[in-house]
Amino acid sequence: MCVKFTDAEIAYIKESVENYSSEFDIYDDEQELKLKIYEQIMLKIKSEYKDTYLFRLIN
């Protein structure tokens, strides 16, 4: 399934992920895992989807 995001939606996702991931206090493995997931989301947005804004959702 593919979902196309607008520029405004991409900006919102980036801001949300950056804000949320900066609030993590690493105190257990679960929090560390969440931080890594959000960092991966940011990397994916910055690299693979920078020009096309096409996201593939894999379940």
From Swiss-Prot:
GO terms for biological process: DNA recombination; provirus excision. Keywords: DNA recombination, DNA-binding, Viral genome excision. It comes from the Viruses. GO terms for molecular function: DNA binding. Excisionase and integrase are necessary for the excision of prophage from the host genome by site-specific recombination at the att site. This is Excisionase.
